Each structure stands twice: as C-alpha cells, then as structure tokens.
C-alpha cells in the first residue's frame, strides 16, 4: 500500500472515531427534560426507550454515524410532542430529567425550543384568511400565543412557549409559517 492509501485509511478511521464521540449539538430539538448540550450527549446511551413510549412518534433517532448518531431528536414538523412526559419517566440515565405531567410543572420546566413566526407566510398576517389554528392547539394558551387585530393574527411569546410543536404541526401553510427552533439558537421571534 502506498503512502496515499495509508493516509486515506487513517483519515477514515479518525472520522469514524470522531463520529462516535459524544459531541454537543445545539442545532437539534431534544425531547422534554433533556440535559444541556454536552451533558445530554454524555448521558444518553441511545437505548431508544424514549422513542418507544412516545405516543405521537415525535422522538426519532438519526441513522448512521455523525455528531448526533444515537441521540434522540424531535421531528416536530411531522409529529408534535403532546407533553405526556413518558419519555422522561423511562430514561435510565437521567439524560432526560423526570418532569411530572402536571400542567404547571410542564409550563415551568419544559423548554424544548422557541417559536419563530414568518409573517410573510402566515394566512392571518398576510390577510389571505383568518386561520388561528396555532393559538387553538397551544396547550400553554395566551402565555405562548395570543391573537391580535381583526385578522386574529398570532403573536408568540417565547417566554411562555414550551416548544411542543403543536402549532407547527397544525399550520396549514405548506411552508409552515410557524416553526420551533432550538432554545438559544438566536433565531426565536419573527421574520
């Protein structure tokens, strides 16, 4: 084998090792009760128990190797979190801290992500219709979203939102006028 072949094998082996190392990723939405990035990846053993008990199948695991291989994430556009907290009850390592499924505890302790509203796509904000589905499905009510003006346009309050994604899942706009982004991503708010 020549020098180039040896270097290629070494680079591939190193990439494989790095792909399996727990690396913090703040770019994905984690299930409720998730420890902070870094601590979560070190604690999670990828046992799939959280995904198995998720009634909506919102908890997914990425395939293959890479930064988030073996660590659960939420696919809220496809299925929202109904805040049942079953995932936090079955986590054997504490990567998902137990949170009782009591509304006041959920409101105080769960921060999956923050809402971002694209007013250019929202039916109520563009004047193309009165929708308001996001407000009707929100379990946090006016703490997280209120309806304003004659078009009953949604106005989101990140501090009152738990990031469950029910609004994102319910949005009838093809491009989804509302989406939940990871907390601390610096993109919460309006566009």
Language-model-detected regions and their locations in the chain:
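Non-ligating segments of multi-cofactor redox enzymes
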Residues: 1-191
